[in-house]
Amino acid sequence: MKRREFIAGGLAGGVAFALGTRAQARGQAQAQTGGASEAEKLARLSVMTYCFDRIVKGLGKPDDPDRTLDILDAPQMITDHYGIHHVEMQHTHFQATDKPYFQEMKGRLRKANSQLTQICLEFDFVDLSSKQKYQQLEMIALSKDWIDYCVQLGCPRVLLNQGPLTPDVVEDAKSTLKQITDYAKTQKVFCDIENRGGGRPAPNAPPNAPVRGGWEVLVEVLKAGGGYANPDIGNFPDEESRAAGLRVMYAMTSGNSHAHYAPDRYDEAKAIGIAKEVGYKGLFSIETSARNNGPDPYAAVQSVRDALLKII
């Protein structure tokens, strides 16, 4: 072999070895961080417009100078600010429900290459725990309307408000939910419900006051009523119930979960770890609060986004 060929061969071998070593190191690093790129992780994040509730235009305060965000601009804003292409909206943020408005919303979503993932229904006077028959019928009727709106908007799910689920209303809640989900299935829309604490007396509650149902009661209602769980990582009274509840609820989802960031209250990485153990492959929808994440909603969402990218 000529000296030039020997040197060239040695250089090629050294380059191949170096590239292989770097690729192996990258593979090991990815394995240590869950094996996903940042783009793949961002594809599993969504942002709740509830995070911007204090600055969304309208909501009965048309002249409030602090309300600067037009909800039609939210999909593009979320894409531009955070690189996230999934949006979860409050039903109260829609400024109309007619066909032209929905066409405009769909166009804005399409332009941002974004997907409306869930509409959260927070009706003022009715929920699944409503006791009076006329209230239950109104809950069913309003929910059906928004299920139809989901179809028009290409949204796969609604989030229903379960109310307190105290022992005296659980059976009625099951029946009301079943009537809603029976209709939703014909429209191919999922009906989700999130956990909202409960399981123990509320602070300063009077003696013998009914206890709000915890995650166990919610699961019972979901199973009887044909709904799906929307695990909310933050909404548990303690670590023991969080660990137990998430293991059950992540196995009952339609693909959406609410994720906060409050390290002084609980271990977010541990909670996400439970989702991984159960095999959850759905979305983590960012939910912020001024108490946990500061008064600036844009910075608050950024902080939760950055924290989640490190652990999902």
Where are these regions (language model features)?
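Glycoside hydrolase catalytic-domain groove-lining segments
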Residues: 237-287
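N-terminal pre-domain/capping segments
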Residues: 2-152, 168, 175-178, 185, ...
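Short secondary-structure boundary segments
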Residues: 91, 162, 261, 287-288
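Short, glycine/acidic-enriched loop or turn micro-motifs at the edges of active sites
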Residues: 91, 197-198, 233-235, 290
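Active-site-proximal segments of metal-dependent phosphoesterases and phosphodiesterases across multiple
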Residues: 200-214
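Divalent metal-binding pocket/active-site signature
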Residues: 157-171, 202
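Short, flexible loop segments at the rims of nucleotide/cofactor-binding pockets, characterized by
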Residues: 64-65, 205-209, 233-237
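Generic enzyme active-site microenvironment
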Residues: 86, 192-194, 230-232, 285
